[in-house]
């Protein structure tokens, strides 16, 4: 028995009709499964469409039309269509009727189906999606059926359709490594830079699979090289460089690849050229780009400044996750063949920037005993030879004793040349007398003697500018066991600490424990239960599954803060929640300058493999604040909104700290200090509010390195400031952090502690 009874509606015909239809269908299924085309046609021609329902499936769930297609019988197919066969059905594996003729190259069947499709209204066979998310175009590309591909495209098949992985026809054609198919498809693609779920474009695939002709075709049609995939933050050229694909690498360079792009480890293509010793590509890049730093003044070299460097320029000061510039890498594995490259790069390098082991480029030049090769370049560089690496060694320690006097001569010349760059801009009188136009007041010989004395006896190899603003990193009391948890009470205590320390700063901690109705409803819709034992106050901006929720009474509280005229700054925590985990950011709002900065503790981008869609978050925040502030001031307020990529380095504080986990992890350390890094940064941001944020961030990182501080120790030690205040508040209600974490606080407890926090006006130092 072939018939599935559930497909019948017994009310539509009497028992005799049902019996005869069953017999006819069984006979037809027997004939078609036996490939008896003539007998099938003879039998069905004796029947009228009313005598059979050819849309009934057999006992295995198969439709008759699929047997006609598989046996490549256009005659039977046409007959079944004439008898009312449905074409919008799928086989037991979820494939559409277009699948088998395309797979097996049954061109006549393809033509029959496409021709019939053009005559009907409803679901189009051309673009029908199967149960796996594939469309006929995908079948044609998968099985390299160019005839089907041409026919489908000529009938306006949607080449821009994306499956569940966001893969479109162009992606598939490139993955099949077939340029003829790519040429057919590319004419119909609206967005050549469409990205898959993993963030890859067709150009990524072409470079990854070393497809030169396809890469060139894509570039000629306008493919964008400046798009990253989401797994490794790779740009297309990264695949080519790492695989030492010289031809495609050169092609991408010729089409303007940006040599300063970084992946998630902070490496650029120049880093990878050195790491894998792909020096032919390195040489080609060096010869096709101008080298420059972020300032035309050779004495001012900025590491990770956010000042724009044109794409046709090499920035030699880009650092990776290990704190290494490309010159660091070359010097750690020094070869004489690097000399010509080093001579080009050194004039534009910050020779005093320390990597994660504390070594500067100058340390490595000294260690390799090649400083004399670059003596003429070092003469015009800022040279701090007294920076100590993690082993406590200075640059001078690495110079062989017999050469130290000669080396100091180079340092003296550098010092002298640096003085002459600026008139009367120095801290000491004799330095001003030795600078620029003032040199007539004192002999050059005398100046060199004074400088040598400063270097040898005072251990100073760089003059200090007058009125220089210096940043001091406070390395707090050593904490071996931190109880900071990153929980809401820690966040509240941290932001309260900041507003106590900086009276001109305000946060949105108010005496109201309510949760906004939209947040309550959203929590219910996604099955999140509010923990009333830990609900102190909703003062965070929440970014939950890429949906934003502002704090309770947000606009009203903002208005009160602004109209009070007591505050210059407002600080906000941002709580980020994804299915893969939680994260924290912060906002710094300068009310006088009308500038908002979003701080991401990991740097300019989201943490690796934690894409919370920062661009959308920034777009929404910028728009919301402009609307709210314009409403408060009753006029259009033009807020300057700085995204992390506008001022933060690729490798930020927490990313650097994470590199120390294997060598510096204590019991009690949380999985991440993102909340604490946000509080720590806002502390320094408020302390140095007049600083450019890019310069502040750069100097903070540099100061931590120069002082040989551990990033993890810095943040762990800082935690005590917050946990002490938190424990003080908890002690006021006779509770401790364990009570809080174990949900032992009552609703009255949380109300009491909120009032204590709100009423705490005492300042801290």
From Swiss-Prot:
Gene3D superfamilies attached to this UniProt entry: Ankyrin repeat-containing domain (1.25.40.20)
Organism encoding this protein: Acanthamoeba polyphaga mimivirus
Start and stop residues of the ANK repeats: 60-89, 93-122, 132-161, 165-194, 198-227, 232-261, 265-295, 322-353, 357-395
Cell membrane keyword on record: no
Taxonomy, superkingdom: Viruses
Protein name: Putative ankyrin repeat protein L371
Cross-referenced InterPro entries: Ankyrin-DD_containing_protein, Ankyrin_rpt, Ankyrin_rpt-contain_sf
Record's keyword annotation contains Cell membrane: no
PANTHER family xrefs: ANKYRIN REPEAT AND DEATH DOMAIN-CONTAINING PROTEIN, ANKYRIN REPEAT PROTEIN
Keywords of the record: ANK repeat, Repeat
Disulfide cross-links: none
């Amino acid at each position: 028995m072939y018939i599935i009874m559930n497909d019948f509606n017994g009310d539509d015909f009497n028992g005799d009709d049902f019996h005869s239809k069953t017999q006819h269908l069984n006979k037809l299924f027997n004939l078609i499964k036996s490939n008896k085309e003539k007998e099938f046609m003879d039998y069905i021609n004796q029947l009228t469409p009313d005598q059979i329902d050819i849309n009934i499936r057999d006992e295995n769930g198969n439709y008759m039309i699929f047997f006609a297609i598989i046996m490549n019988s256009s005659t039977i197919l046409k007959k079944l269509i004439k008898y009312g066969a449905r074409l919008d059905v799928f086989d037991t594996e979820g494939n559409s009727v277009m699948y088998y003729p395309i797979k097996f190259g049954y061109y006549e069947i393809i033509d029959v189906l496409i021709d019939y499709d053009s005559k009907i209204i409803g679901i189009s066979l051309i673009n029908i999606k199967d149960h796996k998310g594939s469309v006929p175009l995908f079948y044609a590309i998968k099985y390299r059926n160019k005839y089907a591909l041409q026919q489908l495209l000529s009938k306006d098949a949607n080449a821009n359709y994306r499956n569940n992985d966001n893969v479109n026809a162009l992606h598939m054609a490139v993955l099949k490594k077939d340029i003829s198919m790519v040429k057919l498809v590319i004419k119909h693609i609206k967005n050549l830079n469409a990205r898959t779920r993993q963030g890859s474009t067709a150009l990524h695939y072409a470079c990854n699979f070393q497809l030169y002709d396809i890469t060139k075709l894509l570039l000629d049609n306008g493919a964008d090289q400046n798009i990253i995939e989401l797994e490794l933050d790779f740009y297309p050229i990264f695949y080519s460089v790492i695989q030492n694909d010289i031809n495609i690498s050169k092609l991408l360079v010729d089409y303007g690849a940006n040599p300063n792009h970084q992946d998630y480890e902070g490496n650029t293509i120049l880093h990878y050229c050195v790491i894998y010793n792909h020096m032919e590509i390195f040489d080609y890049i060096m010869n096709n780009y101008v080298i420059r730093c972020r300032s035309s003044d050779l004495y001012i070299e900025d590491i990770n400044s956010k000042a724009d460097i044109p794409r046709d320029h090499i920035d030699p000061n880009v650092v990776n996750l290990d704190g290494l510039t490309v010159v660091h890498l070359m010097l750690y594995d020094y070869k004489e063949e690097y000399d010509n490259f080093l001579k080009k790069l050194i004039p534009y390098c910050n020779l005093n920037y320390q990597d994660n082991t504390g070594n500067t480029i100058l340390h490595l030049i000294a260690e390799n005993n090649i400083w004399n090769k670059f003596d003429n370049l070092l003469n015009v560089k800022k040279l701090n030879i007294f920076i100590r690496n993690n082993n406590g060694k200075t640059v001078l320690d690495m110079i062989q004793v017999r050469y130290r006097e000669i080396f100091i001569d180079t340092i003296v010349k550098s010092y002298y040349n640096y003085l002459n760059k600026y008139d009367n801009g120095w801290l000491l009188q004799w330095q001003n007398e030795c600078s620029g136009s003032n040199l007539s007041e004192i002999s050059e010989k005398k100046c060199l003697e004074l400088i040598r004395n400063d270097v040898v006896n005072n251990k100073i190899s760089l003059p200090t500018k007058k009125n220089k603003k210096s940043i001091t990193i406070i390395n707090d009391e050593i904490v071996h066991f931190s109880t900071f948890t990153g929980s809401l009470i820690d966040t509240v205590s941290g932001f309260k600490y900041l507003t106590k320390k900086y009276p001109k700063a305000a946060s949105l901690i108010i005496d109201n424990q309510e949760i906004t109705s939209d947040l309550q409803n959203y929590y219910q819709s996604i099955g999140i239960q509010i923990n009333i034992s830990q609900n102190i106050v909703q003062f965070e901006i929440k970014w939950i599954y890429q949906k934003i929720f502002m704090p309770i009474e947000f606009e009203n509280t903002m208005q009160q803060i602004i109209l009070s005229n007591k505050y210059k700054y407002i600080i906000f925590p941002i709580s980020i929640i994804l299915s893969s985990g939680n994260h924290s950011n912060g906002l710094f709002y300068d009310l006088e300058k009308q500038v908002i900065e979003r701080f991401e503790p990991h740097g300019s981008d989201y943490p690796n493999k934690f894409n919370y869609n920062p661009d959308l978050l920034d777009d929404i925040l910028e728009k919301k604040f402009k609307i709210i502030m314009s409403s408060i001031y009753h006029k259009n307020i033009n807020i300057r909104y700085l995204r992390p990529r506008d001022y933060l380095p690729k490798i930020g504080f927490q990313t650097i700290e994470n590199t120390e986990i294997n060598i510096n992890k204590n019991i009690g350390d949380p999985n991440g200090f993102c909340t604490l890094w946000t509080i720590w940064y806002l502390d320094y941001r408020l302390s140095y509010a007049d600083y450019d944020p890019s310069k502040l961030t750069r100097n903070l990182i540099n100061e931590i390195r120069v002082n040989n501080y551990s990033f993890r120790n810095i943040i762990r030690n800082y935690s005590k400031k917050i946990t002490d205040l938190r424990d003080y508040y908890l002690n006021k209600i006779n509770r401790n952090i364990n009570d809080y974490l174990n949900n032992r606080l009552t609703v009255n407890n949380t109300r009491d502690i909120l009032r204590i926090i709100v009423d705490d006006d005492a300042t801290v130092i």
